[in-house]
From Swiss-Prot:
This is Phosphatidylinositol N-acetylglucosaminyltransferase ERI1 subunit. It comes from the Eukaryota. Pathway: Glycolipid biosynthesis; glycosylphosphatidylinositol-anchor biosynthesis. Disulfide bonds: none annotated. It comes from Eremothecium gossypii (strain ATCC 10895 / CBS 109.51 / FGSC 9923 / NRRL Y-1056) (Yeast).
C-alpha cells in the first residue's frame, strides 16, 4: 500500500467517525439520558488514538535503546 492510499484511508475513517459522532449527537440531542452515550462515543476514539500514539512512542524508544554492558 503506497502513502497516498494509506493517507486517503486514514482520512476516510476519520471523517466517518466524526460523521457518526455528529449523527449520534443530533439523535440524542433532546434526551438527556442519551447524552452519556454521546460522551462515550466522542471520547472513546480519542482515548484509543492517544493510547496508540503512546504505545508507538514507547516501542520506538525501546527499539532504539542502546544496550549497556551488564555490571
Amino acid at each position: 500500500m503506497n502513502d497516498k492510499v494509506a493517507a486517503t484511508l486514514v482520512l476516510v475513517v476519520t471523517y466517518s467517525i466524526v460523521g457518526a459522532s455528529l449523527w449520534c449527537l443530533t439523535y440524542a440531542w433532546h434526551d438527556e439520558t442519551k447524552l452519556y452515550y454521546w460522551c462515550i462515543v466522542q471520547l472513546l476514539p480519542v482515548m484509543l488514538w492517544v493510547w496508540c500514539v503512546i504505545s508507538w512512542c514507547g516501542a520506538q524508544l525501546f527499539g532504539y535503546a542502546k544496550r549497556g554492558k551488564a555490571d
